[in-house]
């Protein structure tokens, strides 16, 4: 295993180790994996290549042109597209989030695993966001598909700076043939936080509680949308539920956040469920959301806004 202090670093380390383990250096990826050169180089071919992978509008200034045609994005759940990419671009590494808002369909993850086995491609799962939220490991365990390397962060240290790269011994051993180092990777706070977090995860059965509350939140959204006849699309895992308004999404989302803040609730259409969400929190949240949905159903929300309509989610603004 290797440890870093941030997810971007961990992703870059995983790519380095994987490339050291294969003759085929090109990467096919799906999802958001940080700011490093290997990832942003995908936009050299087209500035819109990364737009469908969480964060849009990313410039590649400062990325060497010779990295062009080394990293290629593919759409989630589109196995046919991925298969063609593998054939045409001599892919040696597949890097992806197991899932974010949309669940895998038509046995997608198993198909990816199978083609990796067949073509001798290294499969890396980025579990920085999903790890330890669905179980005491990665969400890939729920789908019974194992990667060659996996990356964990965020919940790993309960907010403290620590990320981990783990994987098959044969591949991880290749890290000895390249140079991977940082002065601050040796600090001890993150490691202690991770070990303490594991103890609390086990003692409090954290993932069971947050999944239970996440399902309650999804039901709240469903019930209120039906009550007020507001069409919404509910997605995501139980631990990280998300919904979108099918009409005037950004305007309604802005109003929702505005009204929640008035009641001292920090909330939007996405919830990272945590252990401290309790019945009283959910009761207050439901009461405010009921009022918000009622006002949205009446229309003219724009007149009730106290600020500009928010940007597209995760859209680059600097």
List PLM regions with ranges.
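Conserved N-terminal phosphate-binding loop of PLP-dependent enzymes in the Aspartate aminotransferase
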Residues: 1-318
């Amino acid at each position: 295993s290797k440890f870093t202090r941030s997810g971007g670093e961990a992703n870059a380390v995983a790519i380095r180790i994987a490339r050291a383990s294969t003759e085929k250096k090109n990467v096919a990826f799906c999802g958001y994996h940080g700011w490093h050169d290997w990832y942003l180089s995908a936009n050299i071919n087209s500035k819109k290549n990364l737009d469908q992978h969480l964060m849009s509008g990313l410039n590649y200034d400062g990325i060497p042109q010779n990295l062009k045609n080394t990293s290629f994005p593919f759409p989630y759940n589109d196995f046919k597209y991925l298969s063609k990419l593998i054939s045409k671009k001599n892919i040696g590494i597949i890097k992806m989030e197991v899932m974010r808002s949309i669940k895998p369909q038509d046995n997608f993850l198993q198909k990816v695993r199978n083609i990796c086995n067949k073509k001798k491609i290294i499969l890396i799962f980025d579990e920085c966001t999903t790890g330890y939220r669905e179980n005491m490991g990665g969400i890939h365990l729920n789908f019974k598909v194992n990667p060659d390397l996996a990356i964990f962060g965020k919940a790993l240290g309960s907010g403290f700076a620590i990320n981990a790269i783990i994987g098959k011994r044969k591949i991880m051993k290749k890290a000895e043939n390249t140079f991977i180092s940082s002065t601050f990777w040796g600090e001890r706070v993150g490691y202690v936080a991770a070990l303490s977090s594991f103890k609390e995860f086990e003692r409090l059965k954290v993932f069971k509680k947050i999944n239970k509350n996440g399902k309650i939140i999804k039901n709240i959204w469903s019930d209120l949308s039906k009550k007020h006849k507001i069409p919404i699309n509910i997605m995501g895992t139980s631990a990280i539920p998300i919904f979108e308004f099918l009409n005037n999404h950004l305007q309604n989302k802005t109003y929702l956040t505005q009204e929640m803040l008035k009641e001292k609730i920090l909330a939007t259409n996405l919830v990272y469920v945590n252990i401290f969400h309790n019945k009283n929190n959910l009761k207050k949240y439901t009461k405010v959301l009921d009022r918000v949905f009622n006002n949205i159903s009446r229309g003219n929300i724009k007149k009730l806004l106290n600020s500009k309509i928010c940007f597209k989610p995760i859209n680059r603004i600097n």
